[in-house]
Amino acid sequence: MQAKINSFFKPSSSSSIAASVTTDTDDGLAVWENNRNAIVNTYQRRSAITERSEVLKGCIEKTLKKGSSSVPKNHKKKRNYTQFHLELGQSDFLLRHCAECGAKYAPGDELDEKNHQSFHKDYMYGLPFKGWQNEKAFTSPLFIKNRIVMVSENDSPAHRNKVQEVVKMMEVELGEDWILHQHCKVYLFISSQRISGCLVAEPIKEAFKLIASPDDERQLQKESSSSPSTSIQFGNIVLQREVSKRCRTSDDRLDNGVIVCEEEAKPAVCGIRAIWVSPSNRRKGIATWLLDTTRESFCNNGCMLEKSQLAFSQPSSIGRSFGSKYFGTCSFLLYKAQLIDTHFS
């Protein structure tokens, strides 16, 4: 049988072995060359939604970075829930006037209302006072657990500074910048750890007698005879009774506001520049005890002053009514308090 044509081109065994070796070598070299220049992808394809969100986030970040230099950052702020009020023609819309303490405050303002409450309490009941170690104190059986403390120009700065606080409270009713000076003696009434009363006294040499009308004297005698005693004594124990009294115009005013004095001066030793008691403690005998203590301790020699040696500065209608009851006559001594430019502190 005739051989096929392929048989004529079939290499020998030796040549075939060599060719196979050469072919294997050439194939390994080709594989090495292909692997050296190949880029192998080792990541997995992400979802289309994730890719879009990442691209969008990157665009937003680039936009914010570009505008950060010109546009300030918007920090989140806490909401302020402010109480608003409607203006409907109220007379006290902006500021409200307290009829008891006289202070003005803005209703709805938390800080303003808090300050008013603090001032109102101090004015009505007295300034807080814890006491001092070295006190010139006076006591009375009529006022159990209460005392009067005297402060003078030679006392410590802490004592004098406290007096200045009390005087500021007194100025609400009595006016500013005239009550206190360096040569005054101050008497503080202490009750329930509060300063509820204050008397300011100064040395004087003369005063003038007040001229009172006969009608004022008759009115005073009528009130003195009709008023019951406020103290009850059981042996050595004295009880003070509180009296609730209606504040009528005739009780606080014995004249028409005009003060006329005699031209001839009378000798006097102690001038009462100002006397004040907190509103919640009035009509309890505190002002009377302050005056009695002043008479006992004002002079350095220890002698007690007579009532006729005391004089009031220009009193108000309420002060004149109190002075008439204390002295037992409407014709007591008055003097003009001078403005002395020397500070107490």
From Swiss-Prot:
Effect of deleting the gene: Embryo lethality, but normal endosperm development. No effect on pollen mitosis but minor alterations in female gametophyte development. Defective microsporangenesis and anthesis. Major defects in vegetative growth and development, as well as complete sterility; these phenotypes are partially restored in plants also missing WAPL1 and WAPL2.
A UniProt-annotated Pfam family: Acetyltransf_13
Assigned GO CC terms: cytoplasm; nucleus
Segments forming CCHH-type zinc fingers: 96-120
UniProt keyword annotation of Repeat present: no
Gene Ontology biological process terms, A to Z: anther development; cell division; developmental vegetative growth; DNA repair; double-strand break repair via homologous recombination; embryo development ending in seed dormancy; embryo sac development; establishment of meiotic sister chromatid cohesion
Subcellular location per the Swiss-Prot or TrEMBL entry: Nucleus; Cytoplasm
Keyword terms, alphabetized: Acetylation, Acyltransferase, Cell cycle, Cell division, Cytoplasm, Meiosis, Metal-binding, Mitosis, Nucleus, Transferase, Zinc, Zinc-finger
Protein's job: Acetyltransferase required for the establishment of sister chromatid cohesion. Involved in preservation of genome integrity and meiosis. Required for DNA repair and for the regulation of chromosome segregation during mitotic cell division. Knock-down mutants are extremely dwarf. Regulator of sister chromatid cohesion in meiosis which negatively regulates cohesin association with chromatin, acting as an antagonist of WAPL1 and WAPL2.
Family in the record: Belongs to the acetyltransferase family. ECO subfamily.
Name under which the protein is recorded: Protein CHROMOSOME TRANSMISSION FIDELITY 7
Lineage, broadest ranks: Eukaryota, Viridiplantae, Streptophyta, Embryophyta, Tracheophyta
